Amino acid sequence: MEASKQMRVSRPYKISESSKVYHWPGHSTTVLQRLNEQRLHGLFCDVVLVVEEQQVPAHRNLLAVCSDYFNSMFTLGMREAFQKEVELVGTSYVGLKAVVDFLYSSELELDGSNIDYILETAHLLQIWTVVDFCCEYLEQEVSEDNYLYLQELASIYSLKRLDAFIDSFVLNHFSTLSFTPDFLQTVSVQKLCIYLSSGQVQHTWEYDLLQAALQWLTQQPEREVHTCRVLENIRFPLFPEDILLQRVKLAMCSLLPSEANGEGFVEEAMHYHNSLVAQPVLQTKRTLLRSEECLLFVGGEVSERCLELSDDTCYLDTKNEQWVKETSLPARRSHHCVAVLGGFIFVAGGSFSRDNGGNAASNLLYRYDPRRKQWIKVASMNQRRVDFYLASIEDMLVAVGGRNENGALSSVETYSPKTNSWTYVAGLPRFTYGHAGTIYKDFVYISGGHDYQIGPYRKNLLCYDHRTDVWEERRPMTTARGWHSMCSLGDSIYSIGGSDDHMESMERFDVLGVEAYSPQCNQWTRVAPLLQANSESGVAVWQGRIYILGGYSWESTAFSRAVQVYDREANRWSRGPDLPNAIAGVSACVCALNPRLEEKKKKNKDKRQDRGQ
């Protein structure tokens, strides 16, 4: 003690009392390396693991830290906690040594000769990092020759990650695998139903899936009891009527016994086809297309005089970042409205000439079925409408306001596919056109617009409850606007861009501002402004982002072909793939489309090439 006092040096001045923390980056690595050196030299090891009459020395502390199995063994009063040697059952020396080596070195070498042993041991000892490494290794090894074995392995060890990967593999190769003897003999009814019910299953057309189902059912007599369970995953309404009666029904009758009751699915599909107009409200899981939703634009007024109004309906091909024509409208339209109900695209009203002041307003309603790529004309609206809003809510459409040859409208009417008719409901409190609207939790919201009176556009926000047939005022926007866009994303309603008139000069100017409304708080908040003007543009929410398509600038009197994309998380606008033409008065929507046969074949070929097969 005296010596230590003599070693101290007196301070000529005071040292700061502030503290600083120092970090040794390689500390944990060094500790692990030293522990491994001790283990290899037999130093301080306090337990010996015994398996297959071979010994693996280790440190209890490290085993307990890395393994829930050993932690329970050494801390819950089991007899192994006091034994020098602990014998393990249900594992192998190869697996145990590799896993213990990993705990000390953080390195794991996997190959075809040891993967089974290591996975078995890691699962027993509950060392989930090693289990994940094994899954990652096996995922790279999945092939048409071993996927069934690996699927069984995933089932034995409850490896959800590997099981999901193999399911994805089967879905991507279903047209090849589903007719192989191994698949037909081995795949369980549970797995078959998962594959047949998926929207991602590889197939050229629905008949391929029906054949796979019938082949599986007829492999073994005892599978007859699963007929309804399997066939309920085949989307019979997607077959045309002639195919249903001539091929589908014939195939089922020839392969299945009459008591299997397979014909009920054909009858259900025929009822669907015979109820043509009501199909949007007859949707079940069997009427849905097996495809992802696409972003589309419909019609509009193009800037090139020679083109005038457009009849294009195009979707965005994300792989090639270009717009591809899906179909042509039955009639050219601009400043119309589009809504999707039951997977059908409805196009209502709009102008049939470049003079869209209301004199050329239409009351026609067309419906597009992406399943059959077919347009039909259904019941017309009671009033001609242009510059209005069309909502899809529950099992009906709602047309709100607008204008026609008689001026601005306050009327609101609903369309029922069940009756193929329009019915007036509670009207707006005032004449309104050039407004925007959206749906939020089964309520219709509209904002802004004009009423032909002299003065600027409105700030008001209205909410319609179709259950009570009542319109109510909500907190107005911070910015007056018309010809703008509205949409719902997450828990907010967005009011986007548009234009307004100066109070003094009545000159039109562009509004680039964007604001978000919270229905819960009844409050507006400004968010990032648009990159450029967007009056009379199309709007849709797709894959968690807002898309603004085309539009018009009143200040530069120019049409736009720009696509503006809003990322809510980043609160930022960016540019998407340009439209084929500069266009305004366009509508947009999101809907699942039925790829053409040649597109499906190309997609299946691309999948095989991507996997090097």
From Swiss-Prot:
Pathway recorded for this protein: Protein modification; protein ubiquitination
Ranges occupied by Kelch repeats: 294-343, 344-395, 396-442, 444-491, 492-544, 545-593
Start and end residues of each BACK domain: 147-249
Region forming the signal peptide: none
Keyword Repeat attributed: yes
SMART domains hit by this protein: BACK, BTB, Kelch
Residue stretches making up the BTB domain: 45-112
GO MF annotations, alphabetized: cullin family protein binding
Keyword field contains Repeat: yes
Domain of life: Eukaryota
GO biological process, one term: protein ubiquitination
Keywords assigned by UniProt, alphabetized: Kelch repeat, Repeat, Ubl conjugation pathway
Function per UniProt: Probable substrate-specific adapter of an E3 ubiquitin-protein ligase complex which mediates the ubiquitination and subsequent proteasomal degradation of target proteins.
Quaternary structure (record): Interacts with CUL3.
Name assigned to this protein: Kelch-like protein 36
Organism: Rattus norvegicus (Rat)
